[in-house]
Amino acid sequence: MHKKVLVCLPLNDAHRAALEASVPEFEFRFNALDDVHAEDVLWADVVLGNAPVSMIRQNKHIEWFQSNSAGPDAYLKPGVLPENCMVTNATGAYGLAISEWMLAMWLGIQKDMFLYRDRQNQRQWAPIDLSLIH
C-alpha cells in the first residue's frame, strides 16, 4: 500500500531516516512548519504536524491528520478535514516535561534561586537579607 506522508515536525536526520525505514513503501516529504507549501499538503494522504488550516482545508483526500499539539480544535471544525479522516493528537506527550518544569520552578522559588541568579548576573556577591522578602 503506497501512501504519501507530509511531515511538518522538527525532526533531525536520524529521526527522518528511522521514519522512512519503518514504512519503506510510503513516500515522505519533510517540511519545516514555517515552510509548508500548499502543493505539499494537497499531495499528502497523511499529514503529521500542524500544517496551516487554510491549506489542510483544500485537501479532500487526507486519510490521517496527526496534530503535534494536544488540542487540534481548529482542524476539527466542519469542512476542514474530510469526514472519514482519522485525527490523532499529542495528548499526554508533554506531561512529564511540564511536570518537571513545574517542579524546577517551584524549587527555584522556594530556594530564592532567581534572586541569587539576578545578583550573580549583576556581579553582586553580598548576602541577600531574605527576612525582608518572606
Sequence positions of predicted segments:
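Single conserved hydrophobic/aromatic residue that forms the stacking wall/gate
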Residues: 65, 133-134
